[in-house]
Amino acid sequence: SNMDGVGTFSMAKVMQEHKMMTVITKSTTVDQWKAAAGTGLRMQSVSVCTGTNVMFDPESSDWQTMKKVLEMFPDVKMITVDVANAYHQNMVDFIKKIREAYPNKVIVAGNVVTPEMTEELIINGADVVKIGIGPGSVCTTRTMTGVGVPQFSAIVECSDAANGVGGHIMADGGCTQPGDIAKAFGGGAHMVMIGGMLAGHDE
């Protein structure tokens, strides 16, 4: 998960030994990326992360960081576009912008919980759509806005939609024990993102 305390380089160096990806938090600076290089970190095993602020501010810090990281480390193959609730036109426009700028990168985008929006993001350039609004251990979106769908139901519906348009989904949130990961895969998820299960543990 790209949550603070989990989406770190120290975590990535452990996770890469188990063939797992780590999404580095979008608050990570270019200097921190530089410092991580040469420490045994495999850049193919991490994703750079950005929000959509650049749609409002061309000098957005996470966008500028992402561009610099991808220039310095071409082995970083994955870009994660992370917003709490992806149900707005700016998100779709941003995915188009990213795909045009980086045609050969794997783009992960989210979060959504409905098949229609899953299809929309994939059709407009996302390779993988993150599924989950509310189930995460530190997520407050359902509480604050009332938006959300039970996680297993969302996975089942969205995986079917993604398969229909040649994309993939990543189940994000709600895993508190190993069985939850198995349920997500059983429901059709191609990948599962975990955060809370790793939070507070030594790498």
Give the positions of each predicted feature.
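Active-site entrance/lid segments in N-terminal catalytic domains of soluble metabolic enzymes
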Residues: 1-168, 196-201
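Active-site capping/gating regions of soluble enzymes
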Residues: 167-201
